[in-house]
Regions:
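Conserved alpha/beta cores of soluble small-molecule-handling proteins
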Residues: 1-155
Length: 155
């Protein structure tokens, strides 16, 4: 599988991210997933707008303009052997010394990969699929020492 990491397309086994990356240390980053049908990104402009809102929410400058994101995503799609796929990506604040304060000189890490989307049967398309809903209590568990410390570094 070919992935994208900081300006390079490379085999997934060659992709390396620093252990000091704030995404790893603090969960200091955002993600987005763009569905792709017949090699065409679905509602790309809306997904990139949501990415921008997420980046703004954690006060992280967007490392790319819309046209750059689109070009990277389209090239990643072209590297994959499947037509329907989900392009998943993360943008982190990058590698820096371990400190809750935002680093002034860190370069964001941009990682993207793509996986095939599941094929739905006609019955699933016409009749739907079962789902389960649950309350989202992730941020209510401040008593747990999880590695996502995003709440600590953004507020």
């Amino acid at each position: 599988m070919t992935v994208y990491l900081n300006g390079q397309f490379l085999p997934i086994g060659e992709a390396k991210i620093s252990v000091l990356d704030r995404g790893f240390i603090y969960g200091d980053g955002v993600y987005e997933l763009v569905p792709v049908y017949q090699r065409e990104p679905y509602r790309l402009r809306q997904h990139l707008a949501r990415l921008q809102r997420s980046l703004d929410g954690i006060r992280l400058a967007n490392p790319h303009r819309y046209e750059q994101w689109e070009a990277i995503i389209r090239e990643l799609i072209a590297h994959q052997p499947f037509d329907d796929q989900g392009v998943y990506f993360q943008v982190t604040r990058g590698a820096a010394k371990r400190d809750h304060a935002f680093p002034l000189d860190a370069v964001p890490t941009v990682f993207m990969m793509s996986n095939p989307l599941p094929v739905l049967t006609r019955e699933q398309i016409e009749g739907g699929v079962p789902v389960v809903t649950a309350a989202d209590e992730r941020w209510l568990h401040c008593d747990l020492k999880t590695i996502s410390l995003l709440g600590n570094v953004t507020y």
